[in-house]
Amino acid sequence: MKHFKKILDIFKNQQIVFWTFLAMLILPNVMMFFTESTSTIVRIAGIVFPLGLYWLAFTLSSKPGKMFWWLFFFVFLDAFQIVLLYLYGESPIAVDMFLNLTTTNPTETTELLSNLLPAVLFVVVVYVSGMVVAVLSILNKEILQPTF
């Protein structure tokens, strides 16, 4: 219980939450940096451009947890991308992959998910814990300072 309280105390600092959420959102891009077979400049741009946009978005709110929830669509896509990187090794999300989600029967889905258990567990640990920290950030009275 003492260790859990220490972790909670760390995430009461809104600046740490800010940097943690940026790291969570850019994680799939960093993973694709190592798996994609494109030129180095394209892979660097694949990290720097989204990171700049996420950073800009997070500066719009004094509580990073609010912006994390506003960016939930990107959190969902990031989680999906990590599972696909585990499954295929490379390639970003394609439209037909979303169509396959709706047309696959339950037996095939169960078999596929059992093979993806490590990736799904990683996504749950990273992004669900991020959602919990986002709620704690919103409920926290401390805000990001304007000088930050």
Question: For each predicted feature, which ranges?
Answer:
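Transmembrane and membrane-interface helices of multi-pass
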Residues: 2-148
